[in-house]
A protein has these predicted regions:
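Glycine-centered, phosphate/nucleic-acid-interacting loop/turn motifs that mediate DNA/RNA or nucleotide
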Residues: 49
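A short acidic, leucine-rich amphipathic alpha-helix
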Residues: 26-31
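Short amphipathic alpha-helical interface segments
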Residues: 10-20
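C-terminal regulatory/effector modules of DNA-binding transcriptional regulators
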Residues: 133, 140-228
Length: 228
């Protein structure tokens, strides 16, 4: 389904990859899908570039587009669509007003990664150490490009060129402040509500930034006292 195929079409595509050249009747028999649905799906798959139609006399058979080729074609089209969308994108406001609710673990993780990849100068991130492991690539890219990275977590973590503070158990709470303009905060992970709030509303950003700054001050004092 990630590549534009329905669940039924994906099942038929898998059948074609295994069996090779088959008729619609054979596909229906092998997959347990009704003949009418099988023929409709095969026609759709041909349009989507997942199968080829082969006519042998009066018999119509189908063969799969090789998996590697199919994937490359889909990715190429997505890249082309992305270029078109970017070139026709309307100018957005510098600051995002209002509040957006993001639900679902995958959507939240996508937002975290995208937010980090768009950082221009600095980012503050607070979460449990296990969640940091999901963001290693994005964090390393920020540090390599000399962006300021401040991390508040609950267990020791080593990141070169980043300031790491170790505080209380973060649980399922996450928070990101990007360039003092955007905030993502809420619950993420198995067993949580998997709901986050995303906003560029200036007052909200300042409040959240102040809260993190106060926590950092307390953790710094605690760290200094340990070294005395």
């Amino acid at each position: 389904m990630e590549f534009g195929l329905t669940r039924q079409e994906a099942s038929i595509y898998q059948c074609l990859l295994v069996e090779g050249k088959v008729t619609g009747y054979e596909v229906a028999k092998l997959t347990g899908i009704s003949r009418s649905n099988a023929y409709n799906s095969l026609a759709n798959m041909t349009e989507k570039g997942a199968s080829y139609l082969v006519e042998e006399g009066t018999t119509r058979k189908y063969v799969p587009v090789p998996l590697e080729e199919f994937c490359k074609n889909r990715i190429r089209r997505l890249e082309e669509s992305k270029k078109w969308l970017v070139s026709h994108e309307p100018t957005e406001k510098t600051y995002l007003e209002g509040y957006i609710t993001i639900e679902g673990a995958n959507h939240i993780l996508d937002k975290m990664r995208n937010l980090l990849s768009q950082v221009e100068k600095r980012v503050y991130i607070t979460c449990t150490r296990n969640y940091l492991l999901l963001l290693v690539r994005e964090l390393e890219e920020l540090m390599e490009s000399k962006k300021k990275v401040v991390i508040i977590t609950d267990q020791p973590a080593t990141f070169e060129n980043a300031k790491v503070y170790v505080g209380e158990n973060r649980g399922m709470q996450i928070g990101i402040i990007a360039d003092s303009k955007y905030v993502l905060t809420g619950e993420y992970g198995e067993g949580s509500m998997n709901t986050c709030l995303y906003s560029g509303q200036k007052n909200f950003v300042e409040l959240y930034k102040t809260a993190l700054s106060n926590e950092i001050k307390l953790l710094s004092i605690r760290e200094e006292n340990k070294n005395v």
